[in-house]
């Protein structure tokens, strides 16, 4: 059971998210960051 190599992952790489490297999470903000300099278009929804 411990020698399970599926999906081409190395044995030492866990598949659950809690043990991913910190760099993996830290980089997400830069990808999502808006660098266009424009203000966001605010769409009014019901009840606002």
From Swiss-Prot:
Biased composition (Polar residues): 1-12
Family: Belongs to the SspN family.
Coiled coil: none
Location of the region described as Disordered in the Swiss-Prot/TrEMBL record: 1-48
Keyword annotations: Sporulation
Cellular component GO terms, alphabetical: endospore-forming forespore
Source organism of this protein record: Bacillus subtilis (strain 168)
Signal peptide from the UniProt entry: none
Main location: other
Top-level taxon in the UniProt lineage: Bacteria
Start-end of Basic and acidic residues biased regions: 27-36
Disulfide bond sites: none
Name by which UniProt lists this protein: Small, acid-soluble spore protein N
């Amino acid at each position: 059971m411990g020698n399970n190599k599926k999906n081409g992952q190395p044995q030492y790489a866990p598949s659950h998210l809690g043990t991913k490297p910190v760099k993996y999470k830290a980089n997400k903000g830069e990808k999502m960051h808006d660098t266009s300099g424009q203000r966001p278009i605010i769409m009014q929804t019901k009840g606002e």
